[in-house]
Amino acid sequence: MIDHTTTFVLTSTILAAMTTLFLLWVRRLEAGSRRLGYAVVAASGVMCVTYLLMAAGVLTVSTTGRDESVARFLGYSIAWGAVASVIGLISGAERRYTLALLGGILLSLWATVGSWILGGTAGTVISLAIVAGVGVMGATLYGPLARQAQTVSSERTLLFSRLRNLTVLVFVGLLATGMLSAQNLAFTDAFVGQTLATYLDIVWLAGFGGLVLRSTDALADATDDRPATAAVNSSSSTDGATTGSVQSAD
């Protein structure tokens, strides 16, 4: 059986190769589209470093069943932040909905850590926060973000739908792996749990990168839309301030 350290180093090597490939791919994009492309590079690069930290045993905490590295969840927080940012920009939704999406994701992730550390009733209560986080994530993805995505170009709508489906499938898979792990329901041992989580991470990052970087038309349209959106928001703020001044004068 392969030990965890070897698995983590091997995974980090795979992610390093993916990050390099994504970086070269991004450099071939139009200048305006590279910002979204660099989010892909950041997500993959952060998880590459995360797996190296896990291999070194950095930031480990004692959980029910075995020691776990909090570094994985710090990496997840940054990488999923990059994913949420891209989804929000592609959909054209307001920033508050992107933050709501990220908030739901982070709540579920860190509640999972809490459920591992705290056993008994406290662990059960924290598990409810996992469900709440998934609920917020799903409601945001299938609610305001989906509605706004219907108002943008067909290329962006298609990319949003694919990213949404990938996010839901991978995220639910990661949470299911965490719940079935030795720290919770103990349906899987440590080796199986780590292997499943590692596989899902590679699928998630490869899928995210491939979907985003191949959708050049969607990236270009989203980039062109940003200045227009900013101008509209600025105009609305100016109009509101002018109206307020006139009313005060009256």
Where are the model-predicted features located?
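Hydrophobic transmembrane alpha-helical segments in integral membrane proteins
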Residues: M1-M18
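Haloarchaeal acidic low-complexity proteome signature biased toward cell-envelope/secretome components but also
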Residues: M1-T5, G32-R35, Y142-R162, T216-D250
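Hydrophobic alpha-helical transmembrane segments of multi-pass membrane proteins
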Residues: I14-A17, L36-G57, V168-A182
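Membrane-interface helix-boundary motifs at transmembrane edges
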Residues: W25-A39, L89-Y97, A149-L159
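Helix-loop junctions on the outward
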Residues: A31-S33, V49-R72
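Membrane-proximal helix-loop-helix units in multi-pass membrane proteins
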Residues: W80-A82, V86-V152
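Extracellular/periplasmic helix-loop-helix junctions in multi-pass membrane proteins
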Residues: A176-D201
